[in-house]
Structures are given as structure tokens and as C-alpha cells.
Amino acid sequence: MLSRSSGYKRAFLRRTVLETRKDMMSEQVSVSKSNIRGAFGAFFIPGMYTALWAGFVPYLKAKLSIGEDVLGSMILLLGVGSCLSMAIAGKLVESFGCKRVVLLASFIGMLSLAIVTMCSTIVTTTIALFFFGIGVGLSGASANLQAILTEKVSKKHLMGAYHGGWSLGGFAGAGVLLVLLKILSLPVNESIWGLLIILFIAMIAISQFMLTFGRDPNAKVMKKSKSPLSFHPIAIIFGLLSFVSYLVEGAVGDWSALYLFEDKGIVIQEAVMGVMLFNGTMCIGRLLGNTIGKHVTSKQVVVGGYLLGAIAMALIVFLPGHASMYTYLLLGISLAMVVPNLFSAMGEQNVIPMTQAVATSTMLGYMGILMGP
């Protein structure tokens, strides 16, 4: 029995290595439209299920009868889970292939979110949120590695559109949840469960078109590192720049619905519109970003985006009611192309392995989520 198990393991590893070598030989690999769409799905579907979490936050707070301090501590552990999973995401992708990690991440994230909706105590909800964070972190890191690989093989600039897929998923998820809750008056738990089942089935189908990723091609000419992370200045700089953008995106995802409901007087069924508008304009900006990028530099995109974002956040605080809610449109468009520009640059540099660059930068970036609560 042990011999048979070892044989299965060797066969699995051999198949993974062969698939990896095939995909990483860029001269022999052709990227079809289906492959490009598969990578897009790795962003779109996680964007959708994370938007469902954003819409559920006010209901969770009311169900558990907790204050913002307790809720903030619970969301803090969500961020911890994300950071921990991102730290090992690169090694998991190298060992098992990006497609398998994408599926694993979706399963963990969606199952954990379903459990969150069923929990009735602070302890169980916090544990479920920790695992939800693990799923979200793995989803983000593995999706970005899939996108970088697809860009390298196809030699096309796709990162803006891929990150637009996450925002489009967030817009769609918030929009569908809004329809189910406000127009159809369906229960929130059942609405989220039904959507999660559909999304996971869709992810299984779409994953069949993803490229298999195993190792950074730079590893052939560089000393192999056993560490999943890199503390090279390049990775640190990328991480710190990502930190600011993730801080804002995390705050909008976790707090915007509750903020609009409690501080701006928006009815609870409409409170999810803040994240919907934010994701909608961010999606448009990212889908059009590759065209805009031909006329401006990456530095101008990053600096200009952060300045405009600061103005938008100030307006959200000081404007009343629906005016504050609609300002999320400006916030979304201002930050749209900041992170895509950073990840494209990670794929283009040849100083450190791609998996280390992405794992380190995304982990440091998601520290922004830890700082938000």
C-alpha cells in the first residue's frame, strides 16, 4: 500500500514537472484566447466572492451585537491569514502549479465565507474569518503569478485588464447581492450560499484553461533560494508602494458598507453600493489603463493616482449622505492602475525570482489590510 502511494506521488510530481517545463519554454508555448480568459477568471471570481463579504459586514455586526473595536480585531485576523498565505504562495505555485493553487484558494475562501454567515459566536466567526483571509491571500498571489506568466508567454500587456477583472468581479458581486437583497428581498445567508456554489463551479470550469506555472524562468540563471520571500530592496519598494493601495482597497471592502450605513445614514440594503461604485470605476480604469499607459509613465500613474485618491478620501469623510457614497467613484478611478503597474514591473525585472517578488510584495502590500482595522 505504501509502495503504491509512493508511486502515485512520483507520478504526480513527474506530471507536474513535465507540464511546468512545457509551459515555461516560451518558444514552444502558444497562448490562446481561452488561456487569456482563464487567467482573467482567476481575478474575476475572487473579486466577486470578496464583494459578498463586504456586503455581509453590516449584517454580521448586527447579528453578533458587537462594536467596531471588536469587529476591527476580527477583521485584523482576516488580514493575518492573507499575509501568512501570501508568504508561502510562491512556493506552493512552484510545487503544485498555479492552476491547482487557484482552485485550492477558491475552495478555502468560499467555504470559509459560507461558514462565516452561519457562525453565531465571536470566536467561531473569527476563526472562520482567519481561514477566509487565507483563501483571499492565496487567490490574490496565485492570480497575479498566472497573469505575469500569461503576459510573458503572450508578450502582451494584460495586467491592467486582469486587475480590472478583480474589480469587475467586485462590481458584479456587489450588484447581484444588491438585487437579491433589496429588489427580491431574499435572506442574506441563502443569497450568499447560492452565489458561492455557482462561483465555485464556474472556477472549476474556467481553471481548465489556465496555464500551468511551476518555476520562475529566472531560476535557471540564478542561485536557487529556499526562502519563499525576498528582502531585496526591489521587493521591499514594490511592497511599500502596494501597501498604500491595499490599505485603501481593504478599508473600502471591509468598512465602506458599515461606514455608509452608520455614519452617512444610507439604508442597510443600499450600503453595499459604496464598494460597488468603487469597484465599478476601478474596473473601467483598469480595462482602459493599457491604452492610457501609452501616453503617461508608470511614475506619473502611481504619483497622480495617490494624490487624487487622497482628495477622494477627504471628500468621502466631509460630504454628507449620498454625496459621500458617490465619491467612491472618484476613489476607484484614482487608484485603478497603481497596483497593475507595480505587478507588471515585477514581471519585467530580472534581479530576483518572480515568485519571490510577488510573494514578498503582496505580503507587504496586504499589511495595509492589517493596518486598516
Locate the predicted segments by residue.
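Helix-breaking motifs and short loop linkers at transmembrane-helix boundaries and internal kinks
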Residues: 65, 97, 118-123, 318-320
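Symmetry-related core transmembrane helices of the 12-TM Major Facilitator Superfamily/SLC fold
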Residues: 190-208
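C-terminal transmembrane helical hairpin of 12-TM major facilitator-type secondary transporters
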Residues: 299-342
